[in-house]
Amino acid sequence: SILLIHEIGFDNFTFKKLGFKIGSNESSIYRYFESKHKLLLYLSSWYWAWLEYQLVIETFSISESKAKLEKAIEVVTKTNTIDSDFSHINEVILYKIIVNESSKSFLTKEVDTENKEGYFEIYKRLITRLKEMILAIKPEYLFALSLASSILEGGLHQNFLNEHFPSITNCKDG
């Protein structure tokens, strides 16, 4: 599904097209996901969990708060490379899907219900981890959550601009 979504875009993606691509019938895919929106929620959650894993691994041994936050920002805003630990997922292509399509997972009428059902827990936990690193440097900072979510979403947005509107960003590949 990742390769097909990347190839034709989420809006043009259907389970029928996926079934044709993988040599299976459409109904077999519906056994796993009731809609393409639920598939996008799953892929987004997988990505946020993988990014959280990267964040924890990369910052665990850093004791100095400023250096830890700098490394965390680097981890959550960089363009991804292949992770050989997860051979069943192409993180580079999944990252491109997240950059281009992830907002479609939460800019919906169902977002509040899906939030209550826990679909965004990993995403929120990742932002909370960043917030804690910000507060470790400046405990009295009142807007740590806003800054943390802006760092995460801003990185995605800048990478989107780099890919599609490079003349309006200073973000360059990597």
Residue ranges and their predicted role:
Residues S1-T14:
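Short, amphipathic alpha-helix enriched in basic
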Residues K17, K68-K71, V75, S146-E153:
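Amphipathic alpha-helical interaction segments
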Residues K116, L135-G174:
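Hydrophobic/aromatic-rich alpha-helical bundle segments in the mid-to-C-terminal region
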Residues I2-L3, F33-V56:
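An amphipathic alpha-helix adjacent to DNA-recognition modules
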Residues D11-K38:
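Helix-turn-helix
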Residues L94-A136:
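Amphipathic alpha-helical packing segments from all-alpha helical-bundle domains
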Residues Y42, I57-V92:
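Hydrophobic alpha-helical connector segments
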Residues W50, Q54, D83, E101, ...:
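A short secondary-structure junction motif
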